[in-house]
Amino acid sequence: GYSDVIRSSMSPDIPVDSPAITFADTGLLTKQCTNYLSSWGISKRDAEQAVKYALNAQKQYSSDIRRKAENIVRESRRKEEPIILLAGRPYHTDPLIQHKLSEMIANLGVNVISDDIVRDNSEIETQDTYLIKQWAYMNRILKAAEWTARQGNDIQFVQMTSFGCGPDAFLLDEVRDILHRNGKPFTLLKIDDVNNIGSLKLRVRSLVESLKQTPLRGTTEKFRTKEV
């Protein structure tokens, strides 16, 4: 893991802590945090209280960021302005990594939302895929693609990918199929392939201009399976 990479590239005189932490089980998360923090002289009571506050803050953040995206959608539709759902990994929020791509899209007159709009949305199902959904961020990107596919032509899907990141190798095919079955294009931006955003800007501008020429959606296709 990352902790091993960091530890092997630093001076052995610098200690690196890498406790095992899970976020899948609240009880286990609390236990792991209290055990680790106890080594720093923090009491079990304070540690448990801190975890409780942190979980509440995370829940509030998820709600706030989803509500913000929903407000952007409502306001954009009121003004009849186009929207792009820009999906990616957590590290794509770093302007240096994404080359300020979201700002560039906004400068083209398109409002930008993220895949956070489907956070905690249990109404969206992604059963029509061949993937085993075991990664949280991958699942959210799939849900975001499914949500976009159900929307009008005013909302389009653009995905950033970098370094051939792990599950992207097969995730991209599934996202493409979801969108194409619903008559929508899939725009993929490999942002680690460029040093400037000129080519990326051209791709996005082409998408925006094509939407002006083809405002109607295609016909939705059924999910295809084959007996084995």
Regions found by a protein language model. Name each.
Residues G1-V228:
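An N-terminal assembly and electron-transfer interface module characteristic of large anaerobic redox
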